[in-house]
Swiss-Prot record:
Probable ion channel inhibitor. GO terms for molecular function: sodium channel inhibitor activity; toxin activity. The presence of a 'disulfide through disulfide knot' structurally defines this protein as a knottin. This is U11-theraphotoxin-Hhn1a. Coiled coil: none annotated. Belongs to the neurotoxin 14 (magi-1) family. 01 (HNTX-16) subfamily. One of its GO terms (cellular component) is extracellular region. It comes from Cyriopagopus hainanus (Chinese bird spider). Its main location: secreted. The lineage of its organism: Eukaryota, Metazoa, Ecdysozoa, Arthropoda, Chelicerata. Pfam families: Toxin_22 (PF08092).
Amino acid sequence: MNTVRVTFLLVFVLAVSLGQADKDENRMEMQEKTEQGKSYLDFAENLLLQKLEELEAKLLEEDSEESRNSRQKRCIGEGVPCDENDPRCCSGLVCLKPTLHGIWYKSYYCYKK
């Protein structure tokens, strides 16, 4: 019975002493991993920030192009109905009542001068 107690005590002492060494090693490993994790998070954050900035630049560029191209025309082209009281025909055109084939229409149209 004494040999069992001595063996158990010996195993217990070895486990405790080696466990302490492992605990210190584990603490060191955890510190290294957290430092690496922080650097990885910083890298990932910078990468995400760059992608967002590129996306923002593209969106702003598209908005500026869209605003240039979305300007409405302020004049009416040739052969398009117009209002005789408020003619908005383009330069070189006049708002006139149709002749010949268009006399049955009650509207005015933009024609060349």
